[in-house]
Amino acid sequence: MTTFHSLTVAKVESETRDAVTITFAVPQPLQEAYRFRPGQHLTLKASFDGEELRRCYSICRSYLPGEISVAVKAIEGGRFSRYAREHIRQGMTLEVMVPQGHFGYQPQAERQGRYLAIAAGSGITPMLAIIATTLQTEPESQFTLIYGNRTSQSMMFRQALADLKDKYPQRLQLLCIFSQETLDSDLLHGRIDGEKLQSLGASLINFRLYDEAFICGPAAMMDDAETALKALGMPDKTIHLERFNTPGTRVKRSVNVQSDGQKVTVRQDGRDREIVLNADDESILDAALRQGADLPYACKGGVCATCKCKVLRGKVAMETNYSLEPDELAAGYVLSCQALPLTSDVVVDFDAKGMA
């Protein structure tokens, strides 16, 4: 279901020179709908220069039941991030989808775990919520954060992380690595990559001791970190990645199908609708939107999983997938923004969100 609500901006706070935190006021009747699992994101919708824009931003905190916050960092050519910095102000309203995504972790009070987070740049946004909630909810658990930035001045949530370290001095290990700032220790200088993690593993951290690892940041860093953690002994199933979409980047077509004129049945809100694809490379989502369907989506790059649906009948191929887990694929879930029909009897269900 596409569920947007108009939320009022309670405050806009500067985090760094190019990043702001936007806090929305959530009225009491909607607070249950906006209850989130740490690591999930919000999809924001706004009109900019006559065009509707949608972007996903990780929930970074929610100190009160009536508030929820996301952080927006400016990126080169990013229209929504520019809109956020130049136009979003306290008191205005914005269309905000209910929390989505399955990255992260739901803390459990009785659990005693050791967790690792590796982040670079704005990749810290989902980690802040995960770390803060876990340390608060699981009094016997420990967290290590490896956080990479260019300099200390470009570091998002610097004060919030310092406050967490002061609050949990024995349970939070914070390692800040800077690529453009000279430090006494070479170990904390440079970029987070496979070599850096190998060095940390040889002298400071035993990666095999962690129960779960969470990674978020630039694609190259994430790929290096995932490979390094596996080489250092962490099982695949304990490593979780959250990829941010890069606006303007188009994935090269890897699926060659003939779908021009193909009909697909789309089920949403309990109703079936027949759509027709008008090009071999048109996704099910694009075809449905072109024909007036109001389906959930955000990145259109196979990253955020907002457009996830379930194939009830027929066969579908996906061009790329950065967000669905193997068990979701086995259960028949696909990303409609990447889905191309392979047969003439395809039925997809957007109401089936049971594994979200």
UniProtKB/Swiss-Prot annotation:
Q: What is this protein called?
A: 1,2-phenylacetyl-CoA epoxidase, subunit E
The UniProt similarity line reads: In the N-terminal section; belongs to the FAD-binding oxidoreductase type 6 family.
Molecular function, one GO term: metal ion binding
Keyword Secreted in annotation: no
EC number from the UniProt entry: 1.-.-.-
Q: What class of enzyme is it?
A: oxidoreductase
Q: Supply the alphabetized keyword list.
A: 2Fe-2S, Electron transport, FAD, Flavoprotein, Iron, Iron-sulfur, Metal-binding, NAD, Oxidoreductase, Transport
Domain FAD-binding FR-type, residue spans: 2-106
Annotated ranges, domain 2Fe-2S ferredoxin-type: 262-354
**Under the cellular component aspect of Gene Ontology, which terms does the record hold?**
cytosol; phenylacetyl-CoA 1,2-epoxidase complex
